[in-house]
UniProtKB/Swiss-Prot annotation:
Family the UniProt entry places it in: Belongs to the CinA family.
SUPFAM superfamilies found in the cross-reference section: CinA-like, Molybdenum cofactor biosynthesis proteins
Coiled coil: none
Name this polypeptide is given: CinA-like protein
Source organism of this protein record: Syntrophus aciditrophicus (strain SB)
Length: 420
């Protein structure tokens, strides 16, 4: 089955906000095994909305529309859809009472324009909004479905699975199939390299759809299998997963919704190890990512941003002679930072970063993007030298935090043991 997507709003066309709804809907349709052949955005203009609907329904069996269901004058979607198909609007008194009840419950001021949120085209099937005031609706137009939802992401993400998907399955029962999917998250490898490593597996020849989705600093490899039965789809996917892991195990850091910091946190917690972090060029980004994980206080003892040479000396014990001879961005300094923060925090592990994020500060010997990452465990101190060839300061910081967490994950996954 083919599903078109139409997002409506002047704020989308002018670039004032990012269209998160379209990507969410497309992803959910893919999970259901339905294809999205077209995605359009138009402004809050009735003629533009009608033209877009006609065009999309010429290519798709159904269209999911978002936006323009609010109470203000520029919210024109309901009226535009009704006029496009020669339908009259009616006011649903039950919905109106519910909306008024929400305003009264929270003490909101009621403006006359709020009434229009209870207006719907005749013959529409209403789609309840459990978290807001803008209800959606669907219409069957000559065997094709138009489903209209509010543009507020939090409301849309409740109403699509609870309201729209059941209607689609009921209206197009033959289109319901089994879809099995797995997302691998990789780092430190390009799309071309992944494609080359998977070439001999011939996954597509086995009925597996292979998709590459760069999302800096990671690359997502998505494997999808569509079959008549769940058992058949899962069997083919399981075999494809094994082949992908065999070829890409070193670059894979997580699956599906798991994050790199989440994977690191799970390993630290499982092994009952503690960590202290000293950051220079990353400015606290590693610690920030780790503390996004609930319960991180179990393993994260402290994080120190030692940006200046004085901080490296006073807090971490890096000798001035080392800084003078090798510089702040060097392997000896990174090693001593990791050892120093481990000693300071009395932890099992110490992780440190130092580098030149740019756009200034680079030299011929140490160009922009030069980074050293060290990991100390009391037995040995590992150090890696990286050169991130981007002029963007933020990208260098993010890439460094990613490499540091990946270094830590590999250490933990290998079963290495710190000195107790």
């Amino acid at each position: 089955m083919r599903i078109g997507i139409l997002t409506i709003g002047n704020e989308l066309i002018t670039g004032r906000i990012k269209d998160a709804n379209a990507s969410y809907i497309a992803r959910e349709m893919n999970i259901q095994g339905w294809r999205v052949p077209i995605l359009m955005s138009v402004d809050d203009d009735e003629a533009a909305i009608k033209t877009a609907l006609d065009h999309i329904l010429g290519m798709a069996d159904a269209v999911i529309v978002t936006g323009g269901l609010g109470p203000t004058a520029d919210d024109k979607t309901t009226a535009a859809v009704a006029r496009a198909y020669g339908l009259k609007l009616y006011r649903d008194e039950a919905v109106l009472r519910r909306i008024r009840g929400i305003f009264e419950r929270y003490g909101f001021h009621w403006a006359p324009g709020n009434d229009k949120q209870a207006d719907f085209p005749e013959g529409a099937e209403l789609i309840a909004n459990p978290v807001g005031t803008a209800w959606g609706f669907s219409l069957n137009v000559q065997g094709k479905l138009i489903a209209v939802l509010p543009g507020v992401p939090g409301e849309l993400r409740r109403m699509l699975p609870e309201g729209v998907l059941p209607i689609l399955r009921r209206m197009f029962p033959a289109a319901v199939s089994a879809v099995a999917t797995r997302t691998f998250k990789l780092t430190g490898i390009s799309e071309a390299e992944v494609d080359s490593k998977l070439a001999d597996a011939d996954l597509e020849g086995q009925g597996v759809e292979v998709g590459f989705y760069p999302d800096f600093p990671e690359l997502r490899l998505v494997l999808t299998v569509r079959k008549k039965t769940e058992a058949e789809a899962q069997s083919i996917l399981k075999n494809a997963e094994a082949q992908a892991v065999q070829r890409l195990e070193r670059q894979i850091f997580a699956c599906d919704d798991e994050t790199l910091e989440g994977a690191v946190a799970a390993l630290l917690t499982e092994r009952k190890l503690t960590l202290a972090v000293a950051e220079s060029c990353t400015g606290g980004l590693i610690t920030d990512r780790l503390t996004d994980i609930s319960g991180s206080s179990v393993f994260l003892e402290r994080g120190a941003v030692t940006y200046s040479n004085l901080a490296k000396t006073e807090l971490l014990g890096v000798p001035e002679s080392i800084l003078g001879e090798h510089g702040a961005v060097s392997e000896p300094t990174a090693r001593l930072m990791a050892e120093g923060v481990r000693r300071l925090g009395h932890t099992d592990l110490g992780l440190a970063t130092t580098g030149i994020a740019g756009p200034t500060g680079g030299t011929e010997q140490k160009p922009l993007g030069t980074v050293f990452i060290a990991l100390a465990d009391g037995r040995e101190t590992l150090c890696r030298h990286y050169h991130f060839r981007w002029g963007d300061r933020r990208r260098v910081k993010v890439a460094t935090s990613q490499a540091a967490l990946m270094m830590l994950k590999r250490y933990l996954a290998a079963g290495s043991a710190p000195k107790k």
